[in-house]
A protein has these predicted regions:
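Enzymes that bind and transform nitrogen-containing heteroaromatic metabolites
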Residues: 1-247
Length: 247
């Protein structure tokens, strides 16, 4: 058992093998049974930054990365925004554990999705690209495609996309791993059920635009923004693992 991993809330304090190993996700959204249950998992510095030199991969510890894989094993699909994929090479798969691989879902507005170069798990898990009609069609033949109609302002209907994920692709539990614009879109539209947040014991600083925060978008209206409800706290050294309900 790894030493020093403590569940400190809810009480009583106890030592655990790893955060979140025993959780099971509901099969439907909190307030809409036509939607999957959506969780967001992010790591931030103490001063709230989610990237360092444009990348998120160096923020969390080895335990944070293991925790990320634990959450992936609980979900039917893992979703990221295309900007996150463009920023660095990454994998959305599980380790070679023998478990079924989650569906990899990439959300794009432009169709600029470097699957072959930046998705390390490309070829060993099914990939679905979601985007406006023209942008998504650019990816046909390289991945499965879910093409969406857009509003006059160009916004995609993420609620309809989530409904399609559940109805067509059998996604009951969806894990979202950023980036900040996708997080903001989901939270501002009340489409995210829970937030899993790792606080890395680092201070990064940075000017606006140099180091992103967890949510990038307009200020959330006070009357409709979620009021996160703390569900659990794990402590490993100086690293915190927080779980919140967003409903």
């Amino acid at each position: 058992m790894p030493e020093g991993i403590l569940q400190v809330y809810p009480p009583p304090t106890r030592e655990v093998d790893s955060p979140y190993a025993d959780i099971e996700l509901p099969s439907t959204g909190s307030h809409d049974s036509s939607l999957p249950y959506v969780i967001i998992n992010m790591v931030t510095s103490v001063d709230g930054r989610v990237t360092e030199a444009g990348k998120a991969s160096g923020l969390g510890s080895a335990l944070d990365r293991r925790t990320m894989r634990t959450l992936r094993s609980k979900a039917d699909a893992v979703m990221i925004g295309a900007g996150t994929l463009r920023a660095e090479r990454l994998s959305l798969a599980l380790d070679d554990s023998g478990l079924p691989q989650p569906l990899a879902v990439i959300v794009t507005e432009t169709g600029e999705v470097p699957l072959e170069s930046n998705l390390a798990s490309y070829g060993r898990q099914t990939v679905l690209v979601i985007g406006p009609n023209q942008a998504a069609e650019q990816l046909r033949g390289r991945a499965s495609v879910l093409a969406l109609q857009t509003s006059p302002s160009g916004a995609m209907d993420l609620r309809e996309a989530l409904r399609s994920l559940k109805a067509t692709y059998g996604v009951n539990g969806l894990l979202v791993e950023g980036g900040p614009r996708l997080n903001h879109s989901l939270i501002s539209q009340n489409l995210a059920d829970e937030l899993f947040l790792t606080i890395s014991p680092k201070l990064l600083g940075g000017l606006p635009g140099e180091a992103l925060t967890m949510l990038e978008g307009n200020l959330l209206p006070a009357e409709t923004r979620p009021a996160p409800d703390l569900l659990s706290v794990y402590l490993a050294g100086s690293e915190l693992f927080l779980r919140y309900s967003l409903f």
